[in-house]
């Protein structure tokens, strides 16, 4: 914001040109002109403060000499900072060259009131804020587009405000004419009133509130802060405005045009100074009163109201409405800074969004890379856990086997102890028999010795067999110890491996958990950032939509400006035609005047004719003033066309277009009013010309001043031709701008076509989505069929598992029954062997007693011992075979139990897998139902959005058709307005207005009101159109989001379908594996049946052997009961050959121990 600025008074310098050259050279530092005439006189008035431009009036009193009117330069000359400013632009014969002063100082002339003071050549003023001509330090100017900064700042304490009007220039001219003794020249009448000297104070004007352009850059205003003087109450920055051209219309209209010019963009000041030269009077230095505090809306409203109200005959309501309209048109300029900040921050936000998106993609990739490793580690952990369970089961099984082997070893030791006791008893019996033999007769001693030797050999063989059995037992014990050590080492190594794997799995799981937590945290942070960025993006989208709406509004305003430019072109063409007609009329009148002047020279003779000639000269001056006003009007139209060209060139600055459009509209209204006033003045001019013709017809003696008037008219004609060329150039520029606007229109049509193509693409994408939905329905049907097949396979698996369970139960029952039978048979064999041993012991005792009684019982004893040996050997062999069979059966039973447990576990696994598959299938069905519902909802939304888009399209078409109709109506109304204006122009030729003029004016007002109503309706339609476009954009964004959601769901469904297919393949592989296991179990059952059959055959053979042994024992007992009497019979019956034959018949070898 700019600092508050105090008012700055303006100085006026007045210099009489006819004063001596030396004095003028002393005061102003100018060199005397070489071709200066002695009779040149006039008044040079410089108004300091209006953009530093001088105001010059030069009059000449001699005949045939040139007199110059009012001229103010429109802009400074471009030059370096130290270049001096030119004061006047005069012809060669009247101009005086300017003297260059120091760099950075302002030029000035000396008034007649300030002679005698050496510093008065600088035009210093007391009671003002700063020196008008002192050096002004330049600072960086900040261009503010806010309307609130344009108001006059508050006054400082003690600052003197001169509110009295300036003395007019006419009074100064009149004073000079009286000093020369001549007659009053120039404009006389309403400005002949001279004020007292004490009331001739300089006033402050709002013109000084405009920023002064620096010499370096005329586009940006740079405030200058002159050094404060002792007489000033405060110092503040005071800019200077551009001069405003004036004409003969009302002063209120002038001030209104001045306000409109001050509200323009500062870049209009960069025009060529030669183009922006206007002629004006210092009437713009008006009285101003104190205003409200600066920076407030009320202050601006009060200033605008005071400017528009003064000198105007309009009502207060209309003036207030105009003030509010100006404020509304200028208000959007405040919003440009916020939009610029938003656009500046948009790039940074986009970069942040890209960085966050890249980080999110990296985290997702890392997670995707870690996911298979995590799954593999989980699978390895499960496998290691299963292996640990399997090793634990193997350890328990080995422990059970060791326990069984220990019990078997204890049983073997007991049996060995029993055999040792039997052997010791037999040895005692043999010793007793030896003693008996020693005591017995000699012939029987040799036989007994042979028997003893045989029994000794048998005992040695028994001892060797015992040793072999003990060695086998020791070897078994060593093997058991080695197996125990190996099992312990293996179990320890497996425990270490399991512990290592468990620790590794724990570390991996912890790392995975940490990485998952970090990823979840990062994802949460990214999600939060994404939400923030999405909120920012939504805000930016809203702002972009608002800016797009504003751009649409600017485009509409631009179109309106274009139409207004066309209307201005048509008005310019009409003015050109009127100018041509006026030129033709002036040429005809000049020819008539020349003819009449020639006639008047021939017959001029009296004082009455001289007076009439002077009156005619006065009328000619009035004609010149009217021509000057016409030229000013043409310059106004040229400035309007240049402003229109600049507005079209500044198409990129959309924010400033509204203010320019408002200014153009207001200028158009001002131009229309000026055109009406100029038309009235033209009518008055025509009437004056008619009166002049009548006077010329009456006088016919006017000769003097005709040639001068003719020269002036020629100059005016040349100037008119120059203005005509300028207007043609402006028209060419306007045509070029029309071409650029047509290109912009084509670009907008291309954008509309692109939007239509986008809608067609959306329709195609919707069709693709419908096809994808149909494919998903087909995939669901396929999944349903796969689910039915899986259920059938599950039923088959359940049946096979039940059948296998039944078969396993039968096999287990059969093996248990066979084991019980074998155990019972073994127990029977043990009891029989025990009874036989007891019987043998009892019989041995009996035989010993009988041997004691008779020596003939020795042979029986020997036979009995042999039989006992044979039975002992047979029982040992049976025990060994039974033990082996028992071990084999126990191993087979354990194997069958293990296989049954494995099959049971596999069945449990299968049931669990089947249950999990059922759960997955049910969950997938639920998800499919949910997806179907969501897809249906999405299709409904898409259909609704399509209907809404169609409805909005139809509404847009209706709005466009309505807008076209309104434009057509507007064009027709404009044509009617032009026709009415033409009629008014044709009717203005009459002196007395007709009765239809008021009616035409009322019709014109009605047409203008209709145009305003149509403009309002057009704005309403544009606002509705913008709302509809915003709704279409929202719907398109919503459709894109829903499409993205549908694509995501489709991808998820495809992934789930692939997972289901993979699970189906795994289930098929599991089914094949179960079929292989079933076949393997069947083969093992068949092998078990064969082994059972072999065992049963062996058991039957053992039963036959036991039956034979029982029969043999019964035969031997019968032989013992017969009581053989002689030793020969004993020897014949129980000789070694008979014993060997018995042994061979029974199938038991004596050396098989």
Swiss-Prot record:
Residues 207-220, 772-796, 827-853 have a biased composition (Basic and acidic residues). InterPro entries: Myosin_tail. Residues 44-57 are annotated as: Interaction with TJP1/ZO1. Residues 1115-1124 have a biased composition (Polar residues). It holds the Pfam family Myosin_tail_1. The modification Phosphoserine is found at residues 86, 126, 128, 131, 146, 205, 208, 324, 1125-1126. The modification N6-acetyllysine is found at residue 562. This is Cingulin. The gene is CGN.
């Amino acid at each position: 914001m700019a600092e508050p600025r105090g008012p700055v008074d303006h100085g006026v310098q007045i210099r009489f040109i006819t004063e001596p050259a030396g004095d003028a050279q002393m005061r102003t530092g100018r060199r005397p002109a070489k071709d200066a005439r002695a009779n040149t006189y006039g008044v040079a008035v410089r108004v300091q403060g209006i953009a530093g431009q001088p105001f010059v009036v030069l009059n000449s009193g001699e005949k045939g000499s040139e007199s110059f009117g009012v001229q103010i330069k429109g802009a400074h000359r471009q030059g370096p900072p130290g270049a001096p400013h030119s004061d006047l632009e005069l012809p060669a014969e009247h101009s005086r060259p300017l003297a260059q002063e120091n760099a950075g100082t302002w030029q000035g002339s000396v008034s007649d009131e300030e002679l005698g003071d050496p510093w008065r050549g600088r035009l210093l003023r007391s009671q003002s804020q700063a020196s008008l001509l002192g050096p002004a330090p330049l600072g960086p100017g900040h261009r503010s587009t806010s309307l609130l900064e344009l108001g006059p700042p508050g006054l400082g304490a003690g600052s003197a405000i001169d509110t009295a009007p300036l003395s007019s220039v006419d009074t100064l001219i009149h004073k000079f004419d009286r000093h020369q003794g001549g007659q009053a020249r120039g404009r006389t009448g309403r400005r002949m009133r001279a004020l007292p000297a004490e009331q001739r104070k300089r006033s402050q004007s709002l013109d000084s509130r405009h920023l002064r352009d620096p010499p370096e850059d005329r586009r940006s205003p740079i405030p200058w802060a002159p050094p404060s003087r002792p007489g000033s109450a405060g110092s503040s920055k005071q800019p200077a405005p551009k001069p405003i051209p004036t004409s003969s219309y009302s002063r209120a209209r002038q001030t209104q045009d001045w306000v409109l010019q001050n509200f323009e963009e500062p870049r209009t000041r960069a025009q060529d100074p030669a183009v922006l030269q206007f002629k004006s009077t210092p009437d713009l230095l008006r009285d101003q009163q104190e205003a409200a505090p600066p920076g407030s809306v009320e202050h601006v409203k009060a200033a605008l109201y005071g400017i528009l109200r003064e000198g105007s005959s309009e009502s207060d309501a209309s003036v207030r409405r105009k003030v509010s309209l100006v404020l509304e048109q200028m208000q959007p300029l405040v919003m440009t800074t916020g939009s610029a900040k938003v656009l500046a921050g948009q790039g940074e936000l986009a970069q942040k969004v890209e960085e966050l998106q890249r980080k999110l993609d990296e985290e997702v990739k890392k997670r995707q890379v870690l996911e298979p490793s995590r799954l593999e580690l989980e699978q390895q952990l499960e496998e290691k856990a299963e292996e640990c369970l399997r090793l634990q089961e193997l350890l328990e099984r080995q422990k059970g086997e060791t326990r069984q082997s220990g019990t078997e070893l204890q049983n073997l030791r007991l049996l060995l102890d029993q055999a040792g006791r039997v052997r010791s008893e037999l040895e005692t019996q043999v010793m007793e028999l030896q003693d008996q033999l020693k005591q017995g007769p000699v012939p029987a001693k040799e036989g007994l010795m042979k028997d003893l030797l045989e029994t000794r050999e048998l005992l040695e063989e028994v001892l060797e067999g015992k040793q072999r059995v003990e060695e086998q037992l020791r070897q078994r014990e060593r093997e058991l110890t080695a197996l125990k050590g190996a099992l312990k080492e293996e179990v320890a190594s497996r425990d270490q491996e399991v512990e290592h794997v468990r620790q590794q799995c724990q570390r991996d799981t912890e790392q995975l958990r940490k990485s998952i937590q970090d990823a979840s945290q990062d994802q949460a942070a990214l999600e939060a950032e994404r939400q923030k960025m999405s909120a920012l993006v939504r805000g930016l989208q809203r702002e972009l939509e608002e800016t797009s709406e504003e751009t649409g509004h600017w485009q509409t305003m631009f179109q309106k400006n274009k139409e207004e430019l066309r209307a201005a072109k048509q008005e310019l063409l009409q003015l050109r035609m009127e100018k041509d007609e006026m030129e033709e009329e002036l040429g005809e009148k000049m020819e008539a005047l020349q003819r009449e002047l020639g006639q008047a020279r021939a017959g001029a003779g009296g004082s009455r004719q001289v007076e009439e000639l002077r009156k005619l000269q006065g009328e000619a001056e009035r004609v010149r003033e009217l021509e000057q006003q016409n030229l000013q009007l043409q310059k106004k139209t040229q400035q309007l066309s240049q402003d229109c060209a600049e507005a079209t060139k500044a198409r990129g600055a959309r924010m400033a277009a509204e203010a320019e459009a408002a200014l153009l509209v207001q200028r158009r209204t001002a131009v229309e009013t000026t055109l009406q006033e100029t038309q009235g003045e033209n009518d008055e001019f025509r009437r004056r010309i008619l009166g002049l013709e009548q006077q010329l017809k009456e006088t016919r003696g006017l000769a003097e001043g005709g040639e001068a008037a003719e020269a002036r008219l020629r100059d005016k004609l040349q100037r008119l031709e120059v203005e005509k060329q300028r207007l043609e150039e402006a028209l060419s520029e306007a045509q070029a701008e029309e071409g650029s606007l047509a290109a912009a229109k084509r670009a907008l049509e291309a954008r509309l076509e692109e939007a239509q193509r986008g809608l067609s693409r959306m329709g195609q994408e919707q069709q693709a989505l419908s096809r994808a939905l149909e494919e998903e329905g087909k995939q669901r049907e396929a999944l349903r069929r796969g689910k039915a097949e899986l259920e059938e396979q599950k039923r088959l698996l359940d049946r096979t598992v039940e059948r296998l369970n039944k078969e396993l139960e039968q096999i287990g029952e059969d093996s248990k029954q066979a084991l019980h039978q074998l155990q019972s048979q073994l127990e029977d064999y043990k009891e029989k062997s025990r009874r036989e041993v007891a019987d043998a012991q009892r019989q041995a005792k009996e035989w010993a007693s009988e041997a004691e009684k008779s020596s003939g019982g020795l042979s029986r004893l020997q036979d009995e011992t042999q039989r006992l040996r044979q039975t002992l050997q047979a029982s040992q062999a049976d025990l060994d075979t039974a033990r082996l069979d028992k071990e084999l059966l126990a191993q087979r039973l354990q194997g069958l139990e293990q296989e049954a447990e494995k099959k049971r576990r596999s069945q449990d696994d299968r049931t669990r897998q089947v249950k999990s598959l059922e759960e997955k299938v049910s969950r997938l069905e639920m998800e499919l139902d949910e997806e179907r519902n969501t897809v249906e909802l999405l299709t409904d939304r898409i259909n609704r959005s399509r209907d809404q888009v169609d409805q909005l399209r139809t509404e847009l078409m209706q709005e466009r058709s309505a807008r076209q109709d309104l434009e057509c109506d507007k064009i027709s109304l404009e044509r009617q307005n032009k026709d009415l204006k033409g009629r008014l122009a044709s009717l203005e030729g009459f002196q007395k207005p007709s009765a239809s003029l008021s009616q035409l004016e009322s019709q014109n007002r009605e047409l203008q009101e209709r145009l305003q109503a149509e403009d309002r309706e057009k704005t309403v339609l544009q606002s509705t159109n913008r709302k509809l476009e915003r709704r279409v954009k929202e719907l398109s964004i919503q459709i894109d989001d829903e499409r993205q959601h549908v694509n995501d769901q489709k991808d998820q469904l495809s992934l789930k379908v692939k997972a289901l297919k993979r699970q189906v393949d795994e289930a098929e592989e599991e089914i094949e594996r179960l079929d292989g296991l079933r076949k393997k179990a069947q083969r093992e059952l068949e092998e078990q049946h064969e082994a059972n059959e072999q065992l049963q055959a062996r058991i039957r053979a053992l039963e036959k052997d036991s039956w034979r042994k029982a029969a043999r024992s019964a035969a031997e007992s019968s032989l013992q009961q017969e009581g053989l009497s002689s030793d020969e019979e004993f020897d014949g019956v129980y000789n070694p050959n008979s014993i060997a034959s018995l042994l061979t018949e029974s199938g038991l070898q004596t050396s098989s121990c």
